[in-house]
């Protein structure tokens, strides 16, 4: 079963519908005692980084996430949820994240290297470029996926970068280290390429459960 972490800022409907299409059981909750029954977790999110962290802390979901990751359960952060798994964000000054991966969220540049103007927030389809092999990407292709964001991860460890896209800068699109993963785009809104990644995440969770 997949636990979808509800902290008041997630795109819960589209993630839930995507999991229904995959055909896996799931629970959506803001209560650790309900979520801990799950085999793996999805941390969705839209909105302000600092508000999101405040909500997680208020519900003690930050502590819960750390405990589940320490126990070896899989975590997938989506969009803002991916940014939250890193150390900090420069949005509205500075805000501390969950610190599961090294790096920080910084605002996208509004000009590319040639000085051409770019729209921020970035909303649209961009092609993935894979950098490393990973079980999460084993059934996916370097197709187009759908982004909606104003911030991207900078200063991360090269070994944690699984796939990127280009939007003025190299945007980390899929990240992963041990049992912690993130997707800056919305896999649940990204057609075949996105659903392949989401489906594989659920398969990884099922395989991990069988091994126990």
From Swiss-Prot:
Q: Where is the active site?
A: 79 (nucleophile), 186, 188
The protein's annotated catalytic reaction(s) are: 5-[(5-phospho-1-deoxy-D-ribulos-1-ylimino)methylamino]-1-(5-phospho-beta-D-ribosyl)imidazole-4-carboxamide + L-glutamine = D-erythro-1-(imidazol-4-yl)glycerol 3-phosphate + 5-amino-1-(5-phospho-beta-D-ribosyl)imidazole-4-carboxamide + L-glutamate + H(+); L-glutamine + H2O = L-glutamate + NH4(+)
EC nos: 4.3.2.10, 3.5.1.2
**What are its GO biological-process terms?**
L-histidine biosynthetic process
**Per its UniProt entry, which superkingdom is the organism in?**
Bacteria
Q: Check the record and name the InterPro entries matching this protein.
A: Class_I_gatase-like (IPR029062), GATASE (IPR017926), Imidazole-glycPsynth_HisH (IPR010139)
Q: Point out the coiled-coil segments of this chain.
A: none
Q: Which PROSITE patterns match?
A: GATASE_TYPE_1 (PS51273)
The Glutamine amidotransferase type-1 domain, residue ranges? 1-211
Record GO terms (molecular function): glutaminase activity; imidazoleglycerol-phosphate synthase activity; lyase activity
Where does the UniProt annotation locate this protein? Cytoplasm
Please name the pathway.
Answer: Amino-acid biosynthesis; L-histidine biosynthesis; L-histidine from 5-phospho-alpha-D-ribose 1-diphosphate: step 5/9
Keywords assigned by UniProt?
Amino-acid biosynthesis, Cytoplasm, Glutamine amidotransferase, Histidine biosynthesis, Hydrolase, Lyase
- GO annotations of cellular component type: cytoplasm
Annotated function: IGPS catalyzes the conversion of PRFAR and glutamine to IGP, AICAR and glutamate. The HisH subunit catalyzes the hydrolysis of glutamine to glutamate and ammonia as part of the synthesis of IGP and AICAR. The resulting ammonia molecule is channeled to the active site of HisF.
Q: How does it assemble?
A: Heterodimer of HisH and HisF.
Entry's NCBIfam families?
IMP_synth_hisH
The family database entries (HAMAP family) matched by this protein are listed as: HisH (MF_00278)
- Protein name (database record): Imidazole glycerol phosphate synthase subunit HisH
Native source species: Bacillus velezensis (strain DSM 23117 / BGSC 10A6 / LMG 26770 / FZB42)
Tell me the name of the encoding gene. Answer: hisH
